[in-house]
Amino acid sequence: MSMAVDMSSKQPTKDFFSSPALSLSLAGIFRNASSGSTNPEEDFLGRRVVDDEDRTVEMSSENSGPTRSRSEEDLEGEDHDDEEEEEEDGAAGNKGTNKRKRKKYHRHTTDQIRHMEALFKETPHPDEKQRQQLSKQLGLAPRQVKFWFQNRRTQIKAIQERHENSLLKAELEKLREENKAMRESFSKANSSCPNCGGGPDDLHLENSKLKAELDKLRAALGRTPYPLQASCSDDQEHRLGSLDFYTGVFALEKSRIAEISNRATLELQKMATSGEPMWLRSVETGREILNYDEYLKEFPQAQASSFPGRKTIEASRDAGIVFMDAHKLAQSFMDVGQWKETFACLISKAATVDVIRQGEGPSRIDGAIQLMFGEMQLLTPVVPTREVYFVRSCRQLSPEKWAIVDVSVSVEDSNTEKEASLLKCRKLPSGCIIEDTSNGHSKVTWVEHLDVSASTVQPLFRSLVNTGLAFGARHWVATLQLHCERLVFFMATNVPTKDSLGVTTLAGRKSVLKMAQRMTQSFYRAIAASSYHQWTKITTKTGQDMRVSSRKNLHDPGEPTGVIVCASSSLWLPVSPALLFDFFRDEARRHEWDALSNGAHVQSIANLSKGQDRGNSVAIQTVKSREKSIWVLQDSSTNSYESVVVYAPVDINTTQLVLAGHDPSNIQILPSGFSIIPDGVESRPLVITSTQDDRNSQGGSLLTLALQTLINPSPAAKLNMESVESVTNLVSVTLHNIKRSLQIEDC
């Protein structure tokens, strides 16, 4: 039995992105350094002991009491006892039966245990030099020290397993209670309508009336009666104004929709694999640009399908390696819930409007076609969202290659002017080619091709939107890579100590990461221009433009109940995105800008890595003042396109329970934070960067700050101007502090 302790739990965590091919050792996935050879030894029980200095450290949930190990004298005593027993056995016939001598054990003193416990907390796997030094200090043999640490690690593992088992039992009991409650509710629902209380006869009568009205509408429109199967959950609801027109898609034969999808798949493959002259590389930016004349020569039907009056075509292509196998990745695109979660910063609403055709194979995705809706957003309220309806299909091109194809379908013989007025964004054949590489990795080649109507965009973001960077392929690929990387770190069971400081259990690590992810997704919903919120533009006394929205929380247990106000402001800063991101992450500089700290210094309690980049991390920080201590949960994320820093004050007692592995779902969090995006200008002079060499090679940053405040715990309370001014003043003070700290007050 090996004494090396891992952090694997009794039951692996189930995740829809889990892949058997994924390596759950972060060191094995992300670090290519060659590991040194290990020299296995055997302890006094004949077990193998590996003294590998570059091993990961076990996580324990608690410390046990004093332990004891067997000394050299014990071992020598055991050998001596064996000899005496042999002599006694040889003389058994003459002297009768003799009692076997008891083996001696050596109990360490309290002082010895205290010193070894102190070293164990710092280094559970001491090297030879540390063991020698400790043995001399405590008057013990090196083997005694070695065996004590070995036994201590075994105890820690047993404690951890018992703790995780208790958590699993509690979760099982909770699921049983929920199942029982659902069965009872279903039995009640079968006897009466949950909304009006009517019986089954009333429901059948109402259903017949609705069917009759639907048949009349179909007869008037001359449509074939294809069923409309919407799959919109509460968090995926969307405005159906433009759907009044788009239901004309169902007048098309399904074979016609399949034909359009097949043609779009061929076009996507061509767009993804072609080089020059279809794609040309920009000398100024280094990005690929679509040669539209060459595109129309290759696909002449694209000109005929274009809407009149549309003058903006956005086309981009990018590729990258993601940490997920191709099949799992394809499945996530065909599940609207997983798709929305994967691209939470880009998609505010999503729904499957209808399933045109079921797929084949075990997972039923190969050949699947479905009509979908999505509302795309940027993390700022000043850029309008884009609503788009499209047909998505999934094709397995080869055993190792999949294609996810999106295309908006136009209805023949329809009023194109009405269509253009309702649908301001259309997808020309777009999507991604996913190719399995090895060890759970995939290469994703993304093509984003949009036909959008001209819209008014604030000058601050105009360059970013007009160049196609805002909703382009680079943004989608970078977001996908970050999400898959986070999942790998979340599922990992063998985590180095430096990647999980301050959290000693695997269950605690996962609970903290879950709480941080929920906080960040809540921030995404709060900051964008989605129709979830109604933003009002105001101008502060200092002349700063600001957007303000308010909402009432009645039922969400994850947020405080009452009236919540969000104030947001966007501005350009002559600072590189990387430097600005590091500034907000640094707890040593938090007191320079955060009004919550009130000038007090901040210390980090825990820091969990969730990606290869050191900036992708979750931290719990404490702000100590004379009156009280405040804990702040901070989630930092960065990729090649954008960076986000989200934070929120959290209750100390409940957060301590989360650190111990408790469920964080119902902990109230009201997040604020920053979104940092490159300004779209590849080279701008006089920009502050982290190094002097990069001063003229990087652009500035588009910073969006959003602060949320609970102004009244009563949902019935009315919003007043004093409360709004207090929030907007806080935003103004924070922005002023940021400029002063970065020495750019003139901007």
From Swiss-Prot:
DNA-binding region: 101-160
Location of region: Disordered: 31-112
Classification via SMART domains: HOX, START
Induction of its expression: Down-regulated by GEM.
Subcellular location, record wording: Nucleus
Comp. bias (Acidic residues): 73-90
Residue stretches making up the START domain: 250-489
Knockout-associated phenotype: Defect in trichome development. Defect in accumulation of seed coat mucilage. Excessive root hair formation. High seed oil content phenotype.
Tissue and organ expression note: Expressed in individual developing trichome cells of the emerging leaf primordia. Expressed in differentiating hairless cells of root epidermis.
Coiled coil region boundaries: 155-223
Top-rank taxon, per record: Eukaryota
Disulfide cysteine pairs (residue numbers): none
Segments of skewed composition (Polar residues): 58-68
InterPro entries: GLABRA2/ANL2/PDF2/ATML1-like (IPR042160), HD (IPR001356), Homeobox_CS (IPR017970), Homeodomain-like_sf (IPR009057), START-like_dom_sf (IPR023393), START_lipid-bd_dom (IPR002913)
One annotated GO molecular function: lipid binding
Basic residues: compositionally biased ranges: 97-107
Function: Transcription factor involved in the determination of epidermal cell identity. Required for correct morphological development and maturation of trichomes. Regulates the frequency of trichome initiation and determines trichome spacing. Acts as a negative factor for root hair development. Required for ectopic repression of root hair development in a subset of epidermal cells. May suppress hair formation in root epidermis by promoting differentiation into hairless epidermal cells.
Subunit and interaction comment: Interacts with GIR1 and GIR2.
UniProt xrefs under PANTHER family: HOMEOBOX-LEUCINE ZIPPER PROTEIN GLABRA 2 (PTHR45654:SF24), HOMEOBOX-LEUCINE ZIPPER PROTEIN MERISTEM L1 (PTHR45654)
Protein name: Homeobox-leucine zipper protein GLABRA 2
Species of origin: Arabidopsis thaliana
Designated gene of the protein: GL2
